[in-house]
Amino acid sequence: MNGNRVVVTGLGAVTPVGLDVASSWQAICDGKSGAASIEGFDTDAFSTQFSCSVKNFSTEGYLAPKDSKRMDPFIQFGMVAGIQAIRDSGLEITEANCERIGCAIGSGIGGIGSIERNNELILNAGPRRMSPFFVPGAIINMISGNLSVMYNLQGPNLAIVTACTSGTHNIGMGARLIATGEADAMLVGGAEMATT
């Protein structure tokens, strides 16, 4: 890829082995596994009873409780990692540069847990019981959308969905937008929470 030089200036991570970059990296270096018994639902009927899910996660210090309550966990993970990356970068977003800074964060499956819960709610209690926040709390582009609103990112805003490679494709797209001069900075990545 020719054009402007692309560099990484900030990192964020919410993983099965840590809730930020430092703790995740240390756990990886120490050879720790994120695999553990699945919590949150009965797994007796399933042959697999473990997953590599995020543990002990909280949005405290990142999102208002009212806002995080309306978000599927994958959005919470992506939001927290994105906030960490912005903080780590030291990037100052101003009225002068906000139109040149964008966001590209995707997910392979999005809010599958929210979709399952709302389907059950509709079947058991009827459609009027479904929350009006269901769709914005479960669709894949809401990580990019919410972070763009939070930080006034007015540049390119997208969420590429390509299954397990969604995060990689969003990182690549961000690099391409910078290299071609369509953006000066991009907040990029992926998030997932499919243990349901």
Question: What residue ranges belong to the model's regions?
Answer:
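A glycine- and small-residue-enriched flexible loop/hinge segment at structural boundaries
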Residues: 40-91, 140-154
